[in-house]
Design a protein with these regions (language model features):
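Glycine-rich, acidic/polar active-site loops that bind/position phosphate-bearing ligands
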Residues: 140-157
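Short, conserved non-catalytic motifs in the polymerase core
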Residues: 71-94, 113
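Active-site-proximal segment of RNA-dependent polymerases
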Residues: 90-140
């Protein structure tokens, strides 16, 4: 799709934005656009790209836990693993982010989980012949990640 640079310039000038502001925002936009990533200026802009109301997007952020159904499955070696499955509205947003952003970011070779085109066999090959393998299961991993951490991770892209 590409960032509509000329349309942005016309609109920014019509809104009397300073040359410095326009230059900074174009630099930001060009950095993302050249990587094939969508340009997102703020939550309002993201909601526009997602074809949803801004208030709905804000509600996802404010009370994310309310957009998941919870259930448990048995672990191989006893105990239960809590599963959080997003309802369709949130899943649609997550899918858009995955397809339009995350799938376009090249992952380091050692990242295999959830990396497009990588398999569990590739992960196993990296450990072949090793004397020790450390297996870690971090309790409540996804729940422990806050909005600020997500913002910082995406900002670095």
């Amino acid at each position: 799709m590409g960032f509509p640079r000329n349309d942005y310039l016309t609109a920014a000038r019509a809104q009397n934005h300073s040359d410095d502001f326009i230059s900074e925002t174009l630099s930001y936009a060009d950095g993302l656009d050249c990587k094939g990533l969508p340009v997102i200026f703020d939550q309002h802009h993201l909601s526009y790209l997602l074809y949803m109301e801004h208030r709905e997007l804000k509600q996802f952020v404010r009370s994310a836990s309310g957009y998941y159904k919870y259930f448990a499955i048995k672990k191989r070696h006893g105990g239960l693993r809590r599963i959080m499955s997003p309802y369709s509205e949130l899943r649609d947003v997550q899918t858009w982010i995955k397809e339009n952003i995350l799938d376009k970011i090249e992952q380091p070779i050692y990242v295999t989980a959830f990396a497009k085109g990588r398999t569990i066999m590739e992960n196993a090959r990296m450990h072949e012949g090793r004397k020790y393998i450390l297996k870690v299961d971090i309790a409540n991993f996804f729940e422990s990640i806050g909005v600020r951490q997500v913002y910082v991770a995406f900002k670095k892209m």
